[in-house]
């Protein structure tokens, strides 16, 4: 059996992959870096926590509600902020800054919500350890299986949606060439709305899952926003599939890498865990700015085959 830190690391990495994918989907369609992703993730945790405390059962059964709530937050952001700015052809900087304002508003509502939970429902929501409510399956936390299954199932579902449905094909066309898509009659605004629904839903779903591995607080999302963006950038800002891979790699490197370093150099290193995704993000931007999806994988595989013994030269008879 894998060590507990590796199991938690894989769970954490799967959640980061989902959130990084949400960032990329929104950016690909609207060219907006969604900094509200952080607090959307926190809201996903609180939806799961409150439903579990009020209605019981297992925390995982409320993950779909977290997704739906995040999708609603995405719809509000699109109609209230993003669409008016897109219609005015706002710059990417303006679009990004507008999401920071939305993030502040969401964070304020979380603080109010936590006060309500404390004084009216007698809950203690400002420091929650959701792992205490875990269900064990064959000696392994159930969140491990859920995170791993979703990290595989969502890319498959996303691929089927984008390639096998009429709206998915229209969405791809709009992302690749918005002007041409409008000319042939595709409603770009529906595509933008769909991207915010998917992106917001993935943010809150990822937040609900990641709370099973870290302490849930009102600022939980702000503690992992660097990791989310590092995963999105490593995977490639123009590839939803790449962002899933990038998010998983960054999340696993941060969680397990920090533990390995702390085991050798001391626990004081745990306070610097954000350095790992920062280094990965900086290295990615310097070495391959288009991310993993932009690498010439065909040429790399051909070069690897050529370097193998007996593959680089033809044997003459």
Stretch-by-stretch model annotation:
Residues 1-15, 158-166, 195-238, 255-272:
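Inter-helical junctions in multi-pass inner-membrane proteins, predominant
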Residues 1-19, 47, 58-61, 88-93, ...:
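Membrane-interfacial amphipathic/re-entrant helices at transmembrane-helix boundaries
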Residues 7, 29-76, 260-267:
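Membrane-embedded helix boundary and interhelical linker motif in transport proteins
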Residues 25-45, 59, 90-93, 167-170, ...:
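Short, non-helical or kinked segments that cap or interrupt transmembrane helices
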Residues 56-102, 245-250, 254, 288-289:
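Alpha-helical transmembrane segments within multi-pass membrane transporters and channels
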Residues 136-216, 221, 240-246:
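Helix-loop-helix "hairpin" substructures at the membrane interface of multi-pass membrane proteins
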């Amino acid at each position: 059996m894998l060590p507990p830190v590796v199991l938690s690391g894989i769970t954490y990495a799967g959640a980061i992959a989902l959130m990084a994918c949400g960032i990329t989907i929104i950016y690909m369609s609207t060219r907006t870096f969604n900094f509200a992703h952080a607090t959307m993730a926190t809201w996903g945790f609180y939806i799961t926590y409150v439903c579990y405390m009020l209605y019981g059962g297992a925390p995982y059964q409320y993950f779909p509600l977290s997704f739906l709530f995040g999708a609603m937050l995405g719809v509000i952001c699109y109609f209230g902020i993003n669409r008016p700015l897109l219609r005015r052809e706002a710059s990417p900087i303006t679009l990004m800054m507008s999401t920071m304002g939305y993030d502040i508003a969401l964070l304020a509502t979380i603080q109010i919500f936590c006060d309500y939970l404390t004084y009216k429902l007698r809950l203690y929501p400002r420091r929650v350890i959701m792992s205490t409510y875990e269900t064990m399956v064959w000696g392994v936390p159930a969140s491990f299986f859920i995170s791993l299954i979703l990290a595989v199932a969502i890319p498959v579902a996303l691929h089927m949606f984008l390639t096998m449905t009429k709206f998915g094909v229209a969405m791809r066309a709009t992302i690749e060439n918005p002007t041409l898509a409008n000319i042939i009659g595709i409603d770009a605004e529906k595509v933008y709305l769909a991207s915010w629904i998917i992106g917001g839903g993935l943010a809150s779903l990822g937040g609900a899952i990641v709370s099973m591995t870290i302490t849930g607080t009102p600022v939980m999302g702000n503690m992992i926003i660097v990791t989310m963006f590092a995963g999105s950038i490593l995977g490639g800002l123009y590839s939803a599939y790449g962002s899933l891979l990038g998010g998983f790699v960054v999340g696993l490197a941060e969680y397990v890498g920090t533990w390995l370093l702390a085991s050798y150099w001391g626990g004081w290193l745990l306070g610097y865990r954000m350095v790992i995704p920062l280094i990965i993000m900086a290295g990615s931007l310097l070495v391959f700015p288009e991310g993993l999806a932009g690498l010439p994988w065909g040429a790399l595989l051909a070069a690897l085959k050529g370097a193998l013994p007996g593959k680089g030269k033809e044997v003459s008879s």
